[in-house]
Swiss-Prot record:
Its job: Catalyzes 2 different reactions between oxygen and the acireductone 1,2-dihydroxy-3-keto-5-methylthiopentene (DHK-MTPene) depending upon the metal bound in the active site. Fe-containing acireductone dioxygenase (Fe-ARD) produces formate and 2-keto-4-methylthiobutyrate (KMTB), the alpha-ketoacid precursor of methionine in the methionine recycle pathway. Ni-containing acireductone dioxygenase (Ni-ARD) produces methylthiopropionate, carbon monoxide and formate, and does not lie on the methionine recycle pathway.
Xref: InterPro entries: ARD, ARD_bac, RmlC-like_jellyroll, RmlC_Cupin_sf
Species per Swiss-Prot/TrEMBL record: Synechococcus sp. (strain CC9311)
Catalysed reactions, as listed in the record: 1,2-dihydroxy-5-(methylsulfanyl)pent-1-en-3-one + O2 = 3-(methylsulfanyl)propanoate + CO + formate + 2 H(+); 1,2-dihydroxy-5-(methylsulfanyl)pent-1-en-3-one + O2 = 4-methylsulfanyl-2-oxobutanoate + formate + 2 H(+)
Enzyme class name: oxidoreductase
Subunit-level organization: Monomer.
Protein name from the UniProt record: Acireductone dioxygenase
Sites annotated Important to generate the dianion: R118
Site positions per UniProt: May play a role in metal incorporation in vivo: E109
Length: 202
């Protein structure tokens, strides 16, 4: 389930132990799974969010060419309106050797010199956006499109058992490049698995 949670950064705690740090995270100021509310809340903070129509004819595990063809008109519209020059497909699967390394890298707070724009074709992931004195956690699932402006402090968690596929949009043909803040803030907030568990329990 797609969900947005908004936390205040103050009072998150500074414990070194990961479990106690997560437990010390503040209560969410807002929690919603309503797509319109999610879009509206993110928009006020400069984040773009949309739900794209599903492509029922696209099989699970489809190749890059099939995915790009299925979403060609929507991709072209985004490129025309936003100026993104390069588009590719990234798939991370459970048995992928580099999965744990990628998770460790993406979970560190970082920034980009250009927008981070993703459309979820399959699976899910958690974007955490550190904006002023707030942390906004967005669980994105299939058919979610999100655009995070350049310079926004954020991190991404794919979970302990990753399995997702996204379309990535870039203005720079060089692809993904990050500047890490070395702020351990991500340790003080739930990761994807705990966030989804909390959603189920709620």
């Amino acid at each position: 389930m797609t969900e947005l949670r908004i936390y205040a950064t103050r009072g998150a705690g500074v414990e070194a132990d990961r479990d106690s740090a997560v437990a010390a995270a503040p209560e969410a100021l807002l929690s919603t799974s309503n797509a319109e509310q999610i879009s509206a809340q993110l928009k006020t903070r400069g984040i773009k969010f949309q739900r794209w129509p599903s492509k029922p004819k696209l099989e699970q595990g489809a190749m890059q060419e099939q995915i790009l063809e299925a979403y060609a008109s929507l991709i072209a519209s985004v490129q025309k309106n936003e100026g993104y020059q390069t588009v590719d497909v990234m798939r991370v699967e459970r048995d992928q050797i580099s999965g744990s390394t990628l998770r460790q890298t993406f979970r560190q707070e970082h920034q980009h010199a250009e927008d981070e724009v993703r459309f979820f074709v399959e699976g899910c992931g958690l974007f955490a956006l550190h904006i002023k004195d707030e942390v906004l956690q967005v669980i994105c699932e299939a058919n979610d499109w999100i655009a995070i402006p350049a310079g926004t402090r954020h991190w991404f968690d794919m979970g302990v058992d990753p399995n997702y596929c996204v379309i990535r949009f870039f203005k720079n043909s060089g692809g993904w490049a990050a500047s890490f803040t070395h702020d351990p803030i991500a340790d003080h907030y739930p990761g994807l698995d705990q966030a989804r568990k909390q959603t189920t329990q709620g």
